Amino acid sequence: MSRKQLALFEPTLVVQALKEAVKKLNPQAQWRNPVMFIVWIGSLLTTCISIAMASGVMPGNALFSAAISGWLWVTVLFANFAEALAEGRSKAQANSLKGVKKTAFARKLREPKYGAAADKVPADQLRKGDIVLVEAGDIIPCDGEVIEGGASVDESAITGESAPVIRESGGDFASVTGGTRILSDWLVIECSVNPGETFLDRMIAMVEGAQRRKTPNEIALTILLIALTIVFLLATATLWPFSAWGGNAVSVTVLVALLVCLIPTTIGGLLSAIGVAGMSRMLGANVIATSGRAVEAAGDVDVLLLDKTGTITLGNRQASEFIPAQGVEEKALADAAQLASLADETPEGRSIVILAKQRFNLRERDVQSLHATFVPFTAQSRMSGINIDNRMIRKGSVDAIRRHVEANGGHFPADVDQKVDQVARQGATPLVVVEGSRVLGVIALKDIVKGGIKERFAQLRKMGIKTVMITGDNRLTAAAIAAEAGVDDFLAEATPEAKLALIRQYQAEGRLVAMTGDGTNDAPALAQADVAVAMNSGTQAAKEAGNMVDLDSNPTKLIEVVHIGKQMLMTRGSLTTFSIANDVAKYFAIIPAAFAATYPQLNALNIMRLHSPDSAILSAVIFNALIIVFLIPLALKGVSYKPLTASAMLRRNLWIYGLGGLLVPFIGIKVIDLLLTICGLV
């Protein structure tokens, strides 16, 4: 369940962002963005020149210089506003999480067992290793592992999902999160973190962006922008002596305006906002990323390791067919299978009862009325069934039933072995039914592949992403399901060691690997993967090993995570293309205006036929500032994303953002020039 989405320009956020934009005018804040720092210096320089002209210290048009100076300050403010708005949206999301943190008291047990003496201590004083007792109505005071008890827990404050979940000692459901509430029963919990290190604390810090660091691609792009800025700075600096030598020196104000319009201020002003917004969009999908690096890596992923159950298939195997052994009627097999499943509350057991009812109208029977005894499934026996009168009926895996038959002096029929093999080849799981020592036949339990999943894998393949299905099934079953689902490869009979080895193999080939996991046994593979999405319902070890946590605990979310990562990279690339294309158009506006008096031949470049040199320069500076504001929604929401091949995506972006970046400035600058002329401002 996703959290409530904030409006793009929430009034309270806009007001706060405007205040923050002004605060960010200090040199220390500006220095972090080298491109905008150059604009900030230019604004300061032109302001000083305007004051000097107004006071008569320097000759020149003080009004024009002041107008240029004002719009340069506006450019810096707009860039600050874009970053502050993105950060404000993240902080607003974090505030909803802060509401979960409550200063409360905890019952710290003196011994690690229920009923032991307890001391009442502030929750924020609990340390790693402390044992606490929580009962119905209590807020869990710390992250930890359940060591005794079982309870229903409301995790909606963290996940946004209203349905309660069961947390109990042992297994993969022992992990609890501080800030969640016990609805029933009790738990004895061992705290796994120190104050300030809880999952909730880390979520708040990550969402607020306090720990946001520039990603490798962001650093590389920043270096490129700095290089372009230095090139244009040197080029602009050499223009003054050239113009002076020509007998009509260009003013410093015009040179500063030229520099600001030529350097990539658009992407420079939006780069931080794009990174912050990427993490914010991930949170909108109920996924917490530990860093911007994790989001960026998601965009570069080219191998997806996907668990079969819950991701590729619906997760609940359904009985699809009764296949009797030689000499056994199908109805007799269905009758025995239904009897063995009457008290089996698993989805598989319920589906067997329903199939027998549909095929042979076997209904209105229950264990109690039949005076029968239900035999539950255990990890040791790997069978379940029923004892009724003198009949002993069992259903279970092939190996378990084979051992059972041989232990009772029977013989496992060869024709049933063939039927088991046939079921496995069709992608179903064989379940064998036996009465006493006589094998009655096989039930085919079919994994239902999710609708539309094959098409999604085809889209991923177009994007150059390889999909690998991970399953504990045997190779025959795995191969059949893989073919039906349309994945590129599969790992059958998967063990934690096999998953880890597979990830390392792909990484050795230079690929980036993404996977999901929820158990402690998944932790080594999660730690190795480039993008590791841990389920919030999983163990503490899994969550610590991953670099993302899915609050919905939905394995399918991995595909959405990759889409969000790719959208962030596309947004950054598209706006960079647009920004650089902008510079070309602004060149045709400013160069003729600035140097036509010295070099009349440059008038040939004045293809926009702007009103005057002053209006041309001012129009370009105004456009340079306004375009940042107009692109803020695109930076925050991301460009529209379609699963395409890399070459098709490049062509599409060059047409839209390259050509658009050339045309929009020509139109925008011309319109602004006309408005300035009509209003008599130039």
From Swiss-Prot:
ATP binds at D344, E348, F377, T378, A379, Q380, S381, R382, M383, S384, K395. The chain crosses the membrane at residues 34-54, 62-82, 219-239, 254-274, 588-608, 616-636, 662-682. It is a multi-pass membrane protein. Keywords: ATP-binding, Cell inner membrane, Cell membrane, Ion transport, Magnesium, Membrane, Metal-binding, Nucleotide-binding, Phosphoprotein, Potassium, Potassium transport, Translocase, Transmembrane, Transmembrane helix, Transport. The active site is at D307. Mg(2+) binds at D518, D522. GO terms for cellular component: plasma membrane. Its EC number is 7.2.2.6. It catalyses: K(+)(out) + ATP + H2O = K(+)(in) + ADP + phosphate + H(+). Signal peptide: none annotated. InterPro entries: ATPase_P-typ_cyto_dom_N, ATPase_P-typ_P_site, ATPase_P-typ_TM_dom_sf, ATPase_P-typ_transduc_dom_A_sf, HAD-like_sf, HAD_sf, P-type_ATPase_bsu_IA, P_typ_ATPase. It holds the Pfam family Hydrolase. GO terms for molecular function: ATP binding; ATP hydrolysis activity; magnesium ion binding; P-type potassium transmembrane transporter activity. It is found in: Cell inner membrane. It is an enzyme of class 7 (translocase). Disulfide bonds: none annotated. Its main location: membrane. Belongs to the cation transport ATPase (P-type) (TC 3.A.3) family. Type IA subfamily. Part of the high-affinity ATP-driven potassium transport (or Kdp) system, which catalyzes the hydrolysis of ATP coupled with the electrogenic transport of potassium into the cytoplasm. This subunit is responsible for energy coupling to the transport system and for the release of the potassium ions to the cytoplasm. The system is composed of three essential subunits: KdpA, KdpB and KdpC. This is Potassium-transporting ATPase ATP-binding subunit. It comes from Escherichia coli O81 (strain ED1a).
